[in-house]
Amino acid sequence: MPISQAFTRQHRLLTGPQYQTVFDQPEWKVGLGGYLLLVTRNSQPHPRLGLVIGRKRVKRAVDRARIKRRVREQFRCRQQELAGLDIILLVRGRIENPNPNQVTLDITRLFDKLLAKCRQA
């Protein structure tokens, strides 16, 4: 039976302490453009994702939602490769009028860099 690629509640960082653990002790930091991934190992068989995309960094709600959708899609498609990791995506630079294709490309490259770093460790 194939493994589900759904993005369920168990695949999200939900509470402040869960986020704080990743912020306080990231094992890996992977950055690209205005994005940064903070990653640490978790004790669960599946990965968990948290998103921090502030209004100061990405002004329009539609753009914030678009970035979140693209990140969740990449995460959902790569769950098996990311098993056992807690991941937070931060937007650290100001992103004005992001091109949807460029956002997808940046997020794909970011996850590729993360997987390469995980394989080295």
From Swiss-Prot:
- One Pfam family recorded for the sequence: Ribonuclease_P
Q: Which cysteines are joined by disulfide bonds?
A: none
- Entry EC no(s): 3.1.26.5
- On whether Ribonucleoprotein is a keyword of this UniProt record, the answer is no
Q: What is the lineage of its organism?
A: Bacteria, Pseudomonadati, Pseudomonadota, Gammaproteobacteria, Oceanospirillales
Task: Indicate what this protein is called per its UniProt record.
Answer: Ribonuclease P protein component
According to UniProt, the reaction catalysed is:
Endonucleolytic cleavage of RNA, removing 5'-extranucleotides from tRNA precursor
Describe its assembly.
Answer: Consists of a catalytic RNA component (M1 or rnpB) and a protein subunit.
Its cellular-component GO annotations read: ribonuclease P complex
The organism is Alcanivorax borkumensis (strain ATCC 700651 / DSM 11573 / NCIMB 13689 / SK2)
